[in-house]
């Protein structure tokens, strides 16, 4: 059995930076993590062992933490919620991904220009919640079936950063089709690491019929990778660690693909990879040996993209007409 790794997979710079900030905290017991730092149960367990306090992403989100410091996760929070925490005397350690901040800026810009915002994403997801809390007029669209005819004459469309590009295109087309009367402005807020991983998995699916996807079960981008594999007709196994692999899954399999969401740690991916190689007979060989972002060329491109996005948020010409 051959083991073929996707050319782009695993931790993105937003997750990497959030983990670095958490690692530098000297007194974790004085810090409450506002939600899950990243959607990865192994990271959650590590944070708990270090003594971080934890706020869930559900019903207790409106409560004020007892600790003097609050760590904002890579998924971000609304300006309104951040102001509430500061007014309560909390010091915020903000690890919001730069590209999530871009999505927030896009939403607020549309709001201030009088647009009804259509947010393509998963209802209830913490990133979607954070963006929508700063809006007065909006709808969340998980798929094209949710699109309707709106009475608003100005419609602005943005995306949860981990939305599959194909789904965004489909929903955007449905909005235009059902609202020919409206002025529609679309802003692409899907992050580049998500696009890289989606493109890489498409290439992987041209080579294999069985794929192992590594990442948290509540990670949206990981679930989207698994769903895309399923859509393409592949047999897909979504695991969070190597211990979840079942050798019987690979009976008769000649080649297996390996990909991972942005919350999957490099060491976890490597452990899964080595476990797959151990199942191979004769021993498996990876066609791609250096997954992104260890590849210097891809890392440089991502760094340049991040700097461009930070600059773009501040530019008046940032918004694009559809």
What is each of the regions a protein language model found here?
Residues 1-322:
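The feature marks the mature, well-folded catalytic cores of soluble enzymes
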